[in-house]
């Protein structure tokens, strides 16, 4: 998960609502005052020790990129234990269960991701320092998984009935090179019907995402014959070509991102070569480019590819002998972008649900599982998992249960409001 710039949601939503718009704040007050919802809220508070136990157990099951299976199997078991008899693990590893509505109305998906960014072998043992629990991945997004389990328990035990179905999903492949593969599969043509989408990701209870940051990720590999640094001197050098590419890309992209919709670029990793005294046979770099705007992303993508071509041409012109260098441009990831109009009922309900708990909401931009439905035109948002925490994607990541129950109550209220309460 990635979180970016903040806009005050209260001011924006109030301005857009207008005199004729539905009163979503009143809708939330009325819904929250119903006996079954009040009971669900009480159950959430009573389940705080169980929620913490779930969080620790799941955190200590490693879920590196592309290796979420063990955690997914256990999460499916936990959903069954929470009261959902029909749980499936789909072809790519998503864990899915359906809370059935009474009328077959719109289907709402609530999604938290199973995977973490940490490689295999990372110590994920949870330890305590005061009120903090520390472990890689404990917040992002294991807390989201624990939150959903408690939402399920509270709905089942309280007797809440919804008009539409609520699909609870533990997704795979949200992080890094996973490229949102779990949600892309979930929303494939012929997949389960999903009309609205709520991702649970990110730390703060005030979070309401309505803009999805798109990204391209590439591996750029320059290749040549390679040889001895003395005896084969004069051959085209892939390392030199890679250096030229990085220089030219940074020069033009650095100017490009100064204006227009927010856009970023990064050379995150470079590698290649075999020895200090050997001309490499290949050198590579991994490139990440992001933007709030699809057209802007396309433009910086073109700048990157132009820099590749220029570097290849220049280095081949400099070689004194041997075959020309070649280059391979491999697309590693393509995260779609888009925007949900703040006046959309789902966004308005998310803002109102946040205000209901005395928190001023923030409209945000980010890169989450919600990117996919937003790009497909499905109303979608990402809300925070509650509590307090820092250090996402770092070994020192921590989470603390400071009013963490409010994040769970908000998630339940939003899910039920979106699916519709059955009378």
Regions found by a protein language model. Name each.
Residues 113-117, 203-205, 212-215, 270-273, ...:
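Short glycine-enriched loops at secondary-structure junctions
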Residues 20-39, 55, 239-423:
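Metal-dependent amide/peptide-bond hydrolase catalytic core
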Residues 5-15:
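Bacterial N-terminal signal peptides
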Residues 22-134:
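Acidic/His- and Gly-rich active-site-bordering loop/insert found
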């Amino acid at each position: 998960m990635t979180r970016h710039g903040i806009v005050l949601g209260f001011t924006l939503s109030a301005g857009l609502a207008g005199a004729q718009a539905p009163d979503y704040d009143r809708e939330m007050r009325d819904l929250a005052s119903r006996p079954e919802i009040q009971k669900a809220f009480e159950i959430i508070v009573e389940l705080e020790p169980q929620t913490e136990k779930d969080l620790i157990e799941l955190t200590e099951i490693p879920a590196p990129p592309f290796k979420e299976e063990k955690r997914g199997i256990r999460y499916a078991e936990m959903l069954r234990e929470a009261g959902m008899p029909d749980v499936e693990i789909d072809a790519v590893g998503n864990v899915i269960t359906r809370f059935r509505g009474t009328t077959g109305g719109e289907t709402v998906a609530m999604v938290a991701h199973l995977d973490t960014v940490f490689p295999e072998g990372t110590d994920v043992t949870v330890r305590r320092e005061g009120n903090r629990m520390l472990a890689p991945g404990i917040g992002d997004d294991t807390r989201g998984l624990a939150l959903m389990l408690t939402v399920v328990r509270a709905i089942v035990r309280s007797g809440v009935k919804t008009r539409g179905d609520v699909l609870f999903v533990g997704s795979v492949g949200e992080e890094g090179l996973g490229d949102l593969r779990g949600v892309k599969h979930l929303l494939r043509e012929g997949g389960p019907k999903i009309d609205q989408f709520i991702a649970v990701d990110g730390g703060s209870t005030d979070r309401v995402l309505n803009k999805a940051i798109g990204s391209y990720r590439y591996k750029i590999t320059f290749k040549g014959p390679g040889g001895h640094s003395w005896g084969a001197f004069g051959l085209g050098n892939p390392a030199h070509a890679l250096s030229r590419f990085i220089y030219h890309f940074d020069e033009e992209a650095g100017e490009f991102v100064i204006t227009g919709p927010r856009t970023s670029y990064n050379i995150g990793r470079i590698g290649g070569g075999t020895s200090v005294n050997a001309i490499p046979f290949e050198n590579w770099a991994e490139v990440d480019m992001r933007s709030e705007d699809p057209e802007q992303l396309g433009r910086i993508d073109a700048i990157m590819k132009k820099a590749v071509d220029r570097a290849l041409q220049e280095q081949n012109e400099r070689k004194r002998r041997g075959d020309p260098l070649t280059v391979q441009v491999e697309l590693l990831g393509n995260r779609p972008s888009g925007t949900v109009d703040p006046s959309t009922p789902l966004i308005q309900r998310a803002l109102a649900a946040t205000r209901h708990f005395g928190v001023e909401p923030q409209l945000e931009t980010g890169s989450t599982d919600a990117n996919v439905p937003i790009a497909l035109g499905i109303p979608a948002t990402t809300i925070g998992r509650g509590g307090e925490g820092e250090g996402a994607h770092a070994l020192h990541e921590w989470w603390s249960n400071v009013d963490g129950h409010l994040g769970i109550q908000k998630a339940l209220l939003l899910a039920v409001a979106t699916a519709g309460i059955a009378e």
